[in-house]
Protein backbone atom coordinates (compact mmCIF):
# COMPACT_ATOMS: atom_id res chain seq x y z
CA UNK A 1 0.00 0.00 0.00
CA UNK A 2 2.79 2.43 0.90
CA UNK A 3 4.57 1.61 -2.34
CA UNK A 4 1.47 2.50 -4.37
CA UNK A 5 1.16 5.85 -2.59
CA UNK A 6 4.85 6.64 -3.21
CA UNK A 7 4.53 5.68 -6.89
CA UNK A 8 1.42 7.85 -7.20
CA UNK A 9 3.18 10.87 -5.68
CA UNK A 10 6.22 10.31 -7.91
CA UNK A 11 4.10 10.08 -11.07
CA UNK A 12 2.22 13.30 -10.23
CA UNK A 13 5.52 15.07 -9.52
CA UNK A 14 7.00 13.81 -12.79
CA UNK A 15 3.93 14.92 -14.74
CA UNK A 16 4.05 18.45 -13.28
CA UNK A 17 7.81 18.74 -13.81
CA UNK A 18 7.54 17.54 -17.41
CA UNK A 19 4.84 20.11 -18.17
CA UNK A 20 6.87 22.92 -16.63
CA UNK A 21 10.06 21.90 -18.47
CA UNK A 22 8.32 21.76 -21.85
CA UNK A 23 7.18 25.37 -21.42
CA UNK A 24 10.63 26.58 -20.29
CA UNK A 25 12.83 24.91 -22.91
CA UNK A 26 12.06 27.39 -25.75
CA UNK A 27 12.83 30.30 -23.41
CA UNK A 28 16.17 28.74 -22.40
CA UNK A 29 17.05 28.04 -26.05
CA UNK A 30 16.36 31.64 -27.05
CA UNK A 31 18.50 33.00 -24.21
CA UNK A 32 21.30 30.57 -25.08
CA UNK A 33 21.23 31.59 -28.74
CA UNK A 34 21.35 35.28 -27.77
CA UNK A 35 24.38 34.60 -25.57
CA UNK A 36 26.06 32.68 -28.41
CA UNK A 37 25.58 35.43 -31.01
CA UNK A 38 26.47 38.19 -28.58
CA UNK A 39 29.67 36.47 -27.47
CA UNK A 40 30.68 35.92 -31.11
CA UNK A 41 30.11 39.62 -31.83
CA UNK A 42 32.12 40.75 -28.80
CA UNK A 43 34.91 38.29 -29.69
CA UNK A 44 35.01 39.68 -33.25
CA UNK A 45 35.29 43.19 -31.83
CA UNK A 46 38.17 42.17 -29.57
CA UNK A 47 39.92 40.35 -32.43
CA UNK A 48 39.67 43.49 -34.56
CA UNK A 49 41.49 45.46 -31.86
CA UNK A 50 44.12 42.79 -31.15
CA UNK A 51 44.89 41.93 -34.78
CA UNK A 52 44.48 45.52 -36.04
CA UNK A 53 42.29 44.59 -38.95
CA UNK A 54 38.61 44.56 -39.75
CA UNK A 55 36.37 41.73 -38.54
CA UNK A 56 33.24 41.33 -40.63
CA UNK A 57 30.12 39.32 -39.81
CA UNK A 58 27.98 38.10 -42.71
CA UNK A 59 24.47 36.85 -41.91
CA UNK A 60 23.87 34.31 -44.67
CA UNK A 61 20.34 33.05 -43.92
CA UNK A 62 18.04 32.57 -40.94
CA UNK A 63 20.43 30.15 -39.22
CA UNK A 64 24.02 30.71 -40.47
CA UNK A 65 26.47 33.53 -40.02
CA UNK A 66 30.10 33.85 -41.03
CA UNK A 67 32.83 35.65 -39.09
CA UNK A 68 35.59 36.92 -41.39
CA UNK A 69 39.05 37.99 -40.30
CA UNK A 70 39.54 40.54 -43.10
CA UNK A 71 43.35 40.72 -43.25
CA UNK A 72 43.48 43.24 -46.12
CA UNK A 73 40.49 45.31 -44.87
CA UNK A 74 38.65 45.23 -48.20
CA UNK A 75 35.36 43.88 -46.81
CA UNK A 76 35.45 40.87 -49.13
CA UNK A 77 36.16 37.19 -48.54
CA UNK A 78 39.59 36.52 -50.04
CA UNK A 79 41.80 33.43 -50.17
CA UNK A 80 43.88 32.97 -47.04
CA UNK A 81 41.55 34.92 -44.74
CA UNK A 82 40.20 33.00 -41.75
CA UNK A 83 36.46 32.31 -41.89
CA UNK A 84 34.35 30.80 -39.15
CA UNK A 85 30.82 29.70 -40.09
CA UNK A 86 28.33 29.34 -37.23
CA UNK A 87 25.01 27.49 -37.34
CA UNK A 88 22.75 28.78 -34.56
CA UNK A 89 20.38 25.83 -34.95
CA UNK A 90 23.11 23.28 -34.24
CA UNK A 91 22.61 23.93 -30.52
CA UNK A 92 19.32 25.87 -30.51
CA UNK A 93 17.01 24.00 -32.89
CA UNK A 94 13.98 26.28 -32.97
CA UNK A 95 15.78 29.65 -33.03
CA UNK A 96 15.99 31.72 -36.21
CA UNK A 97 17.84 34.97 -36.77
CA UNK A 98 17.40 37.97 -39.04
CA UNK A 99 19.84 40.84 -39.41
CA UNK A 100 19.38 44.32 -40.84
CA UNK A 101 23.00 44.52 -42.04
CA UNK A 102 26.38 42.78 -42.02
CA UNK A 103 28.38 44.64 -39.36
CA UNK A 104 32.13 45.28 -39.35
CA UNK A 105 34.32 45.90 -36.35
CA UNK A 106 37.24 48.23 -37.01
CA UNK A 107 40.73 48.10 -35.42
CA UNK A 108 39.79 50.79 -32.88
CA UNK A 109 36.86 48.72 -31.62
CA UNK A 110 34.24 50.86 -33.33
CA UNK A 111 31.68 49.48 -35.74
CA UNK A 112 30.50 50.28 -39.23
CA UNK A 113 27.52 48.88 -41.13
CA UNK A 114 25.51 49.03 -37.91
CA UNK A 115 23.13 46.15 -37.45
CA UNK A 116 20.21 44.90 -35.46
CA UNK A 117 19.98 41.14 -35.11
CA UNK A 118 16.65 39.65 -34.06
CA UNK A 119 16.54 36.10 -32.71
CA UNK A 120 13.11 34.47 -32.60
CA UNK A 121 11.47 31.24 -31.50
CA UNK A 122 8.14 30.12 -30.02
CA UNK A 123 8.82 31.88 -26.70
CA UNK A 124 9.32 35.30 -28.31
CA UNK A 125 12.15 37.35 -29.74
CA UNK A 126 15.18 39.29 -28.58
CA UNK A 127 17.13 41.98 -30.37
CA UNK A 128 20.89 42.53 -30.37
CA UNK A 129 22.03 45.98 -31.47
CA UNK A 130 25.48 47.22 -32.39
CA UNK A 131 26.21 50.91 -31.89
CA UNK A 132 28.77 53.02 -33.76
CA UNK A 133 31.04 52.87 -30.70
CA UNK A 134 31.11 49.07 -31.02
CA UNK A 135 28.85 48.40 -28.07
CA UNK A 136 26.90 45.16 -28.39
CA UNK A 137 23.64 45.29 -26.44
CA UNK A 138 20.66 42.96 -25.94
CA UNK A 139 17.15 44.36 -25.93
CA UNK A 140 14.09 42.27 -25.11
Predicted ranges, named:
Residues 1-8:
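N-terminal signal-anchor/signal peptide hydrophobic helix marking the start
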Residues 12, 16-46, 50, 54-140:
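N-terminal helix-rich module
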Amino acid sequence: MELIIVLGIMSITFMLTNTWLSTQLPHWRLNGAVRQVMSDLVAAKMNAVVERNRQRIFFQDNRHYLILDDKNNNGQIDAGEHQDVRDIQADYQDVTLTASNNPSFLPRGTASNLASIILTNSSGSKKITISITGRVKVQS
